[in-house]
C-alpha cells in the first residue's frame, strides 16, 4: 500500500493488485475524510474509474482545493468510522 494523497482534509491510500487474492485482483483505494473521521474502500470497477478520473485530474495540475473537491464526491459513501489500532 502507498499513500498517494494527503491534505489537511483527505488522505488516499492505494492498494496494488495482488495476484491470487480474488478480492484484491484489481487493487483498490482507501479514501479517508479526516474532518468527518470516515472512510471508504473502493475496488473493482469503481476503483478503475477512480484511477482514470485521478489521471485526468493530475494532467490539469490541480490545486489542493480542487483535489479535495474531487474527493468530496465520495463523502456521502463514507460510512465506515476511522478506527485507530
From Swiss-Prot:
Organism domain of life: Bacteria
InterPro entries, alphabetized: DUF3567
This protein's name: Protein BTH_I0359
One Pfam family per UniProt: DUF3567
Native source organism of the sequence: Burkholderia thailandensis (strain ATCC 700388 / DSM 13276 / CCUG 48851 / CIP 106301 / E264)
Observed effect of gene inactivation: Disruption confers partial resistance to cellular contact-dependent growth inhibition (CDI) CdiA-2 of B.pseudomallei strain 1026b, but not to endogenous CdiA. Increased binding to B.pseudomallei strain 1026b inhibitor cells.
Amino acid at each position: 500500500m502507498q499513500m498517494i494523497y494527503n491534505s489537511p482534509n483527505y488522505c488516499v491510500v492505494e492498494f496494488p493488485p495482488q495476484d491470487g487474492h480474488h478480492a484484491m485482483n484489481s487493487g483498490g483505494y482507501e479514501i479517508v475524510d479526516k474532518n468527518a473521521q470516515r472512510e471508504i474502500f473502493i475496488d473493482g470497477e469503481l476503483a478503475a474509474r477512480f484511477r482514470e478520473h485521478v489521471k485526468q485530474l493530475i494532467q490539469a495540475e490541480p490545486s489542493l482545493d480542487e483535489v479535495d473537491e474531487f474527493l468530496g464526491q465520495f463523502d456521502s459513501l463514507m460510512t465506515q468510522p476511522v478506527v485507530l489500532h
